[in-house]
Amino acid sequence: MPELSLFVWWLIGGVSSLFLLLAIYLYFFSYRPRAVENCEIVSNDERKTLPAGKTLKVMTWNQEFFGGRNHVYFFDLPMDKGKRITVEEAEMKRNRDHLIKVVKSESPDVLLLQEVDEGSSRTRYHDQEGELAKKLKDYPYRTSAYYVKSAFHPHRHILRPWRMKLVIFSKYSIDEAKRYQLAVKPALWIVRLFYLKRCVLEARIPLSKGGHLSVMNTHLDAYAQGSNTMAKQVKGVKRLLDERTEAKAPWVLGGDFNLLPNDMARKQLTKDQAELYNPHTELSY
């Protein structure tokens, strides 16, 4: 009996140690942003305000981590059924150079980017924001916000680092930048810990006659059918817009909403395509 008791205590100790290691892993490797956070601003020393009466040109682009549209990546399909996982170096360079060429040609005042990778295994650990900054010299002001940030992501197709963010490039100064957390898709608690933390990134650009223009960038959820996640996220974005409207503060919003403009649009899709969207567009909320 004493030997059995000793074995039981060893077993309890071993299981407790495993739970402790799991708790440490979850704490250090999961991303748990606060509801509102300040974001780092990169700029030169010159302060450049937006002139009164100027027409502002804004470009928004989901760059899809420079992966391009020639492949179906695992997260491009429901249940992660896509085949491709990693982007080839040549593809990334070609897609990055194409984005830079278009931006320089269109010359927007503000550039909103989604799905910008940094130190991710799928994009061979490139700093995509930094690479763009070196080429887009006309945009000395920028800020960014993560919506995936994991040194080791437990998804079966990843199992390595994954970091992805929203980025705003601007020709004009950014005085303040904030990240606003949106609703997270319902799931088991451990899945929610590592699930994408969708958000809104706001950059406040100073106006020459005083005050600021709020420029907001977002990327809402996809494949959230059967839940009210998208509706909650739309309401979260609308709340931010309403607050600025009530304060008589000018704003502009762009990004990838993963939504249809109206219910009629869904009827024009194939059956398989329509199943990716709820029967009624969340934009009606």
Residue ranges and their predicted role:
Residues 2-135, 146-154:
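N-terminal, active-site-proximal structural segment of metallo-dependent hydrolase catalytic domains
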Residues 82-89, 116-119, 183-192, 219-228:
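Surface-exposed cleft-lining segments at the edges of enzyme active sites
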Residues 133-138, 161-177, 203-208:
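Conserved beta strand-loop-helix elements of the APE1-like EEP
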Residues 172-210:
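Active-site catalytic loop in hydrolytic enzyme cores
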Residues 194, 204-231:
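Metal-dependent phosphoester/phosphodiester hydrolase catalytic core
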